[in-house]
């Protein structure tokens, strides 16, 4: 598809974006707002942002949720800006520097929270900076400006939501239903591959794809939850299905690993059974019914524990899947499944990455301040705002450099486009609200097409063009002011890009090591006799960390296999019948403390020392298990875990 071609599926959102812009423009001028531009800009960003992220029309609820986050971020930023101004109005330079630190602090938080919620914190950072910079000539008008800014933003968000509702947004429910069916078939096919014990690379690709698809289904659940409250029951079921899908992956991969040392555990009965190919969810349903009969006939003791656990999880998955598709009332059997174990939240492994983002944002804002004060340029304030916007938004994403380039391309494209509107279109349409609305609707329509195609610079061009054309009340046309604003945007983006290049992010290897050590800590923490601790559900958190590892190190199969082995060890030890006595309980606590020291160690020497101590404690623990006559279900997983840690100790301790 060419850059300027229009696909049918893109037209509806383009009309939706144009409608949001026109509504915000009309309401802004109708209520005599001082700067309707902010309402129009907000409507455009709230509507276009999810479309750019999705690469097409966003699903129902995405625009509303983004608008909600923007309101929260704006209010937090306005309150922070007011507090900073009240406390430091007598020291303007210090006030701006504190604002720069506040922007960095918000970026630091946004790097640690969930990616969906990070938008609010990024917005809070640069909103405070915008307020502080804008009120420099008249600081006594700060409360009035903050109220006006909040009002204009709320109007823009409401207009974007109304436009979204007018053009019947897509529901994600049908996609969820199809993915649930397809995912079950893929889970069965993974188990077939693992029982055949064929090529390891094929198995690695299969389980890696399933981890990504399960994570994608979790994202769909979030969208469905945002869409409407009527999907509350489906949302509860999908949350449990996430854990069940991860359990199926874990049991399949453990079946494969067991055959490396004890292939006789998988009998010919099960090998022949899983030879039957499946194509649809109905085929899987028939096979599961037959498999349950086989297990009932052979007995639980004669069935490998991984296959028995896999069938139990697949049966629960199937039951909840039917409930999601029909969205019927939750019955007693489903309620028992949904009342499962509480999920555990783990500490972020990206703290060093978050600190790099803090310094990038803070230093770029301070650099912008120095540039503004040194040059005395009237649009230095505009450059500072763009610096804060680019760094706050770029830092949340996997590739900040490309986001900064997108903004540079967008601001460059906005210069001729804004020039056309400033010199020709708006002066000739300002006497007619209808013509003015049509002219901006055309801009929104065509940029809406390009935003959905993720054309480099399209999102930046949309925001930058609206920002520099005259949409104030009353309209004034000063060419020097327009040129200053346009050049200020470009200079701000270039300065932000320069700081991103200079402050290098070398946290990738450290993050990978912390993630692997967190897997080790989780496996060690599973060795416990505490009933409450054994009931905790670590699986979603562990696979979330594995997904992050896969994104940080694409194609690094040894790391993925090591992480998956730790997850399998955690699940097996969690269910192992460890003898209950005070001696073992005290030693469990000691090993957990040592594992925590491995994660928190700041130097390689300390980390190696604590890791060596952990290996010694595992040897002592195995001896204690023999003394207390622990069954093979306990001793074998512990022995495998100790062997893995010995084998990979350099990868787990060296920077």
Swiss-Prot record:
Membrane topology recorded in Swiss-Prot or TrEMBL: Multi-pass membrane protein
UniProt xrefs under InterPro entries: PHBA_efflux_AaeB/fusaric-R (IPR006726), PHBA_efflux_pump_AaeB (IPR023706)
Keyword Transit peptide: no
Transmembrane segments: 13-33, 38-58, 69-89, 93-113, 121-141, 152-172, 370-390, 407-427, 431-451, 455-475, 482-502
GO BP field: carboxylic acid transport
Family of this protein: Belongs to the aromatic acid exporter ArAE (TC 2.A.85) family.
HAMAP family, per database record: AaeB
Protein name per the record: p-hydroxybenzoic acid efflux pump subunit AaeB
Organism: Shigella boydii serotype 4 (strain Sb227)
């Amino acid at each position: 598809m060419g850059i300027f071609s229009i696909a049918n599926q893109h037209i509806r959102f383009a009309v939706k974006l144009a409608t949001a812009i026109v509504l915000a423009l009309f309401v802004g001028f109708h209520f005599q707002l001082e700067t309707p531009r902010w309402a129009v800009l907000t409507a455009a960003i709230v509507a276009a942002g999810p479309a750019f992220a999705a690469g097409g029309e966003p699903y129902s609820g995405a625009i509303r949720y983004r608008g909600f986050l923007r309101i929260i971020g704006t209010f937090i930023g306005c309150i922070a800006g007011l507090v900073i101004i009240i406390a430091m109005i007598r020291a303007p330079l210090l006030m701006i520097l504190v604002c720069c630190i506040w922007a960095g602090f918000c970026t630091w938080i946004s790097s640690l929270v969930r990616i969906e919620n990070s938008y609010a914190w990024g917005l809070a950072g640069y909103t405070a900076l915008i307020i502080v910079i804008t009120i420099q000539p008249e600081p006594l008008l700060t409360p009035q400006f903050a109220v006006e800014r909040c009002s204009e933003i709320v109007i823009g968000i409401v207009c974007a939501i109304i436009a979204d509702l007018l053009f019947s947004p897509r529901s994600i429910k049908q996609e969820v239903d199809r993915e649930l069916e397809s995912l079950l078939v893929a889970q069965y096919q993974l188990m077939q591959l693992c029982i055949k014990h064929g090529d390891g690379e094929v198995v690695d690709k299969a389980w890696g794809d399933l981890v990504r698809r399960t994570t994608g289904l979790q994202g769909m659940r979030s969208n469905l939850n945002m869409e409407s409250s009527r999907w509350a029951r489906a949302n509860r079921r999908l949350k449990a299905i996430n854990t069940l899908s991860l359990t199926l992956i874990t049991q399949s991969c453990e079946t494969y690993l067991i055959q490396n040392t004890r292939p006789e555990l998988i009998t010919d009965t099960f090998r022949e059974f899983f030879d039957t190919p499946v194509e649809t969810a109905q085929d899987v349903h028939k096979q599961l019914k037959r498999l349950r009969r086989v297990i009932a006939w052979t007995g639980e003791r004669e069935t490998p524990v991984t296959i028995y656990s896999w069938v139990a999880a697949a049966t629960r998955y199937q039951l909840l899947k039917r409930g999601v598709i029909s969205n019927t009332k939750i019955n007693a059997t489903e309620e028992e499944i949904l009342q499962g174990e509480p999920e555990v939240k783990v500490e972020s492994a990206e703290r060093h990455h978050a600190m790099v983002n803090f310094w990038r944002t803070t230093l770029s804002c301070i650099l912008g301040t120095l540039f503004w004060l040194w040059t005395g340029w009237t649009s230095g304030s505009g450059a500072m705002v763009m610096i804060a916007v680019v760094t706050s938004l770029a830092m949340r994403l996997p590739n900040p450099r490309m986001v900064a380039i997108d903004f540079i391309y967008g601001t460059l494209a906005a210069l001729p486009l804004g020039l056309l509107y400033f010199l020709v279109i708006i002066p000739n349409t300002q006497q007619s609200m209808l013509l003015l609305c049509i002219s901006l609707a055309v801009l929104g329509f065509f940029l809406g097409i390009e935003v959905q195609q993720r054309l480099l610079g399209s999102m930046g061009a949309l925001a930058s063009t609206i920002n520099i054309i005259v949409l104030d009340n009353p309209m004034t046309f000063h060419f020097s002011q327009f040129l200053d604003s346009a050049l200020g945007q470009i200079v701000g983006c270039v300065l932000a890009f320069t700081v991103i290049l200079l402050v290098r992010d070398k946290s990738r290897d450290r993050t990978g090591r912390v993630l692997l050590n967190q897997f080790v800590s989780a496996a060690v923490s599973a060795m416990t006799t505490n009933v409450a601790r054994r009931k905790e559900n670590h699986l979603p958190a562990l696979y979330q960390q594995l997904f992050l590892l896969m994104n940080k190190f694409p194609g690094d199969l040894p790391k993925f296999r090591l992480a998956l082995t730790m997850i399998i060890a955690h699940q097996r030890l969690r269910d192992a019948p460890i003898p209950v006595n005070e001696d073992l309980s005290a030693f469990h606590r000691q090993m957990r403390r040592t594992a925590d020291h491995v994660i928190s160690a700041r130097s390689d020497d300390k980390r190696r020392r604590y890791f060596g101590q952990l290996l010694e404690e595992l040897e002592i623990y195995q001896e204690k298990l023999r003394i207390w006559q622990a069954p093979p279900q306990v001793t074998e997983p512990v022995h495998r875990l100790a062997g893995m840690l010995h084998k990979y100790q350099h990868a787990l301790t060296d920077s």
